[in-house]
Amino acid sequence: MVKKGAGEFKNRVDRVVKRDGRVVKFEQEKITKAVLKAFAETGEGKEAEAKKVSSKVVQLLNKNFKKGNVPEIEEIQDLVERVLMILDFEETAKAYILYREQHRKIRESEEALKEAVDLVDKYIQEIDWQVKENANMAYSLQGLNNYISSIVSSKYWLNRVYSKAIRDAHDEGDFHIHDLDKIAVYCCGWDLQDLLRRGFTGVPGKIACKPPKHLRTAIGQMVNFFYTLQGEVAGAEAFSNFDTLLAPFVRYDGLSFKEVKQCMQEFVFNVNVPTRVGFQTPFTNITLDIVPPKNMIEEAVIVGGVPQKEKYGEFQEEMNMINRAFAEVMAEGDASGRVFTFPIPTYNITRDFDWNDENLKPVWEMTAKYGIPYFANFINSDMDPDDARSMCCRLRIDNRELHKRGGGLFGANPLTGSIGVVTINLARIGYLSKNQAKGQKGRATGRAERKDFFARLDKIMDLAKESLETKRKIIDSFMKKGLYPYARFYLDNIYKRRGNYWANHFSTIGVIGMNEALKNFMGETTATEKGVKFAEEVLVYMRNKLIKYQEETGNLYNLEATPGEGTSYRLAIKDRKKYPDMIFANGQVGENEKIEPYYTNSTQLPVNHTEDFFEALDLQESLQTKYTGGTVLHGFMGERIQDAETTKKLVKTISEKYALPYFTLSPTFSICPSHGYLIGEHQLCPKCVVEQKCEVYSRIVGYIRPVEQWNKGKATEYGDRKEFVVG
């Protein structure tokens, strides 16, 4: 508390960070002059009072900032507002707040034109790290167009939609609001059966297709659906029951296996064409049932938009053909041996899964070679194949919660997803929270320090909730105005039942940097017993808070293990600038610009902790199962598993022994322009007589891309990774 009668205070803060990032000399006189201008408008004080205010600000600066930590301009101005209120200069405080806001708008207006020109240069010259923020986006004219439009959309959200508190929390790095570059929802799961029933149609003035009668037509409409709806969704799209719903078309068309494989080849090649804005491939996911789900066995099949006499349970042979053909196409790769990044297939592993099914051999080969699929564990996890659907690389949907809340959803109608995602910077909370154990490995963290940690978490989570509620209202209003015409058509049944198009879509809060939070807070990690125990406590606390949010708002919330492709780097950069002594995933990098800082994804292990996959599984199981929104454990491997049979046994062991909901096996591989696929990492082709550069591929977060396209933070993480060894 600042005492009103306090006199001059000796200043130990000698530097300040300006808005452009430059560090300059701190001058108390500038604070005095700014306050004096505000006094001139209100008449509440003169130079003596202005000096008094600036002295109190200096006093608070020295209290709040340790030696070596440098305050930012905005933080100093926040303190000026606070001191004016404490000293009862209320009118001046209001004038000062108005002054700040007016000058912010003036600065933005002046910067707008310069920014527009600079943006082109930044992209062309690849100056901005965000040029490579998304590894799915290649350097191109379309990438340039997307880069420019993304900045405009971000400014719209931050300056026209969100409150100042939310804007500041994002800009300063307390949390990260995802997909600010798009005025759209995060991800959507669509109802493939509805598409087969109605066809690709529904928007006035646009081409309308009748319900498909043939497999090739159905697949063509699926591709067009993905392409078109990707323009109305910021992130991933998904279809569930891919093999179950398409199997009847195989019989009705009288197709041979060769013809089915040709159809699958057309589908896979078409969905990997970079047609999305920014020269991206649409981010697509499909779920394969392998056997008909119990809730669909007696359901009439849809062909030509009409229910037929046969039931889905009668088409196991055709499902086998689709699954084998799809897996063979994915395992073969493209003409150069490159991996098909999309669609990401999710395979449901159930208790009655037939591990000896010969038709699934290509699945194990695809997994061993490229590591493409996700495996959904329905054996030991809390999920059920009839009511849980994989939505994208990270979003795990539990429809049972929706059912309890009147959503009326079931396995064949997965019209759900996520409105938006906000990721909490746990690393910063750990650093800022007072604790006795910092730097003293093994010491117990006291009550006061724990209280401070959870108080900070509370505050940031409440702001995240506010931002998500705001986004939901904005997106809903835009939906009603027709900004998302196809989504409005295919979500019409939800609107009829619930009175809101997005009623089944979650508001998602994620976490990043738990490992670094533990390092900074209590000298532990996600690989130590005490660290795991505290991490579990934090996740349970967050889950309970999300339940309260659901009760308060009537909207669905979930907790996600954020992928953090760009977030892990963006937040680390901000924290290094503000707190040079902070510990990152790669240690105390300080102000050394040659080392790129990054945070460990969600509550994952340090990337260099172990080569033992089963040790990692043991350490992660209790944390992975705490998420309600989505999580996956990636088994990063230095090279492919040579034997597909070993791959199958490994997947079987993990599914039967662990309760992890989702996992992958992710080998590193290379592509030579002449020799195609190469096992492991090769910067240069070992087979070429003339030296040729190779593309090195690995899974960046949820999907597989060339390492060369990764941002600097993720590229540093890749270099630090200790890959698992599988015998």
Predicted regions and their residues:
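A conserved active-site cap/scaffold subdomain adjacent to cofactor or substrate pockets
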Residues: 457, 510-513
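Charged, amphipathic alpha-helical regulatory modules used
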Residues: 2-119, 123, 722
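Long, highly charged low-complexity segments enriched in Glu/Asp and Lys/Arg with interspersed Ser/Thr
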Residues: 90-103, 658-662, 666-668, 712-727
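Long, charge-rich boundary regions
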Residues: 670-673, 690-727
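Well-ordered alpha-helical scaffold segments within catalytic/enzyme domains
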Residues: 515-524
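Metallocofactor- and cofactor-centric catalytic cores in central/energy metabolism, strongly enriched
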Residues: 39, 260, 264, 520, ...
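Conserved catalytic cores of very large enzyme subunits
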Residues: 102-106, 112-503, 524, 528-679, ...
